[in-house]
Amino acid sequence: MTKKPIPVITSFGGVNASGRSSDHIGYQNTVFDSLFKKDQTKVLKDLAVMQGLIKASGNSWSKDSEKIENLNDFLNQNSDQIRSNTMVRKLDRELYDPDGIILDQIKASAGGQLPTGFNPGSFYSSRQHARALQMTIFGMSDTLGQFGIKWSEIEEKVSPDQIAVFSGSAMGNLDHFGLGGMMQSRIKGSRSSSKNLAFGLIGMSADFINAYILGNVGRTGHAAGACATFLFNLQLGKEIIENGTSRVVIVGSAEAPITPEIYDGFFANSGLSDDKRMVSLQSQLKEKEKEPNQRKACRPFGDNIGMVLGESAQFIILMDEELALEIGAEIYGSVPTVASHADGFKSSISGPGIGNYITLAKCVASANEILGSKTLQEQTFIHAHGTGTPANRTSESHILNKVAKAFGIKKWPVSALKSFLGHSMAVAGGDQLISTLGTWDKGVIPRIHSIQKPAEDVYDDNLDILINDKVEKPNFFKAAFLNAKGFGGNNASALILGPDVTLSQIKKRHTNKAFRDCLLYTSPSPRD
């Protein structure tokens, strides 16, 4: 029986509230306090450039046209300011809410907006492009930069119909350059542009990649499923590599949901972390802040009140392992299992159901078969969906705890990135995947920074809900699980294997000479 190709991750990139994804910059921002000093300086430098705080001037650096004598000193002295312009924070009124609908009427002032001063559309001719599409261009370019191999080399090795692209949004592109502009124009006394409708479509991210970056004529598409969208696209990519239909697949999502209309929608269903309830919770928890502390607006698995929206665009390049060997691509991990299931009959479309129990259990069973029970129990972790709502903290923790108990996992490390990034809707699973690749490299799982302890109604007998970074050596963790509980019953989970496990699997299939001849993975430096 012929073995299926192994879908391996050969590049990644994108951007979200924590920074750009390549070189693990955004991930490192979420584990900043656990980094070595040199890595902290590297992150600060990258963020300062993104924000336009510093610029290269020949062989030196400048701020506001004045030369910086010692860049490291400058970065260290301004560390708090630089990082305060990233991750979940107070919304920028001028950019997101000039009419005061969010800040003055709804009064929900927190958002996981892109780093202050960063404009993804400034790097190319982006006139009238919806924000998520600008983020797509930046994010996919970032991915190709991380890849380190010219795309023309892929085109020489692979026929055009063996390349595929799956990317898009869940909500649609609803800012004023997309569907938002089309819906608002007559009300505001103007008319829709010829681009509003097209640029608002949910699959337009893939179209932009095909038309403006890769020139792709192969398969294209997008599997939208609320918060599980990225994992749905990942499942598509994995399956067509395994069945031989495609050899290279771009998997991604892009979403820019920080608009007054979307905030209003989540506010209406009581899912949003608004200022009034934020202050009330801070008082209940005896925290010192009297005004809304936007930094802690999203509190997954703790005492919480609701979610925060965030912007993100994330992409990976999947390919079969033989092609990766042939071109000498770096391998960051592999995707053996992605499961998606609906909830079946239920009384409320927004309520939880059985689907997520099935998806996660399937992925954990797969890991148990591949890694064995001991490694599963001691060297894996999970990125929970962790929206920050009271309903999620009980329903998802029950799922995680039940599955952990069933497989003999005593204290399963649980992270929830939305405390840092907000909820990027379609891209939530992509944020998790990018962070996972960072954990392979640095050995650190991000904590849930906004909580002091799990809420009393959280099911955590078999869970280790991380209130501190979990620090191990690089590649200590052999596998990670990504989880998404999407609105309406769109549930998906994924098993991601680390690079050393992936390489071990590849080595069993291929000759030692083929393995030696290819630069597959550069091991990260061990921690002290």
Where are these regions (language model features)?
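Conserved catalytic cysteine-centered active-site region
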Residues: 1, 47, 92-134, 172-236, ...
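Flexible, low-complexity linker/loop segments at domain and module junctions
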Residues: 1-9, 154-160, 372-377, 407-409, ...
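A glycine- and small-residue-enriched flexible loop/hinge segment at structural boundaries
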Residues: 1-151, 167-182, 201-219
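Condensing-enzyme catalytic core mediating Claisen C-C bond formation in acyl metabolism
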Residues: 5-13, 17, 29, 277-373, ...
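Active-site-proximal alpha-helical scaffold in enzymes
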Residues: 136-149, 202, 206, 221-255, ...
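Beta-strand segments within the central parallel beta-sheet cores of soluble alpha/beta enzyme folds
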Residues: 153-164, 219-225, 249-254, 330-339, ...
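Acyl-CoA/ACP chain-elongation machinery
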Residues: 245-305, 338-352, 386-393, 410-463
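A glycine- and small/hydrophobic-rich beta-loop-beta segment
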Residues: 357-381, 386-389, 396-402, 406-409
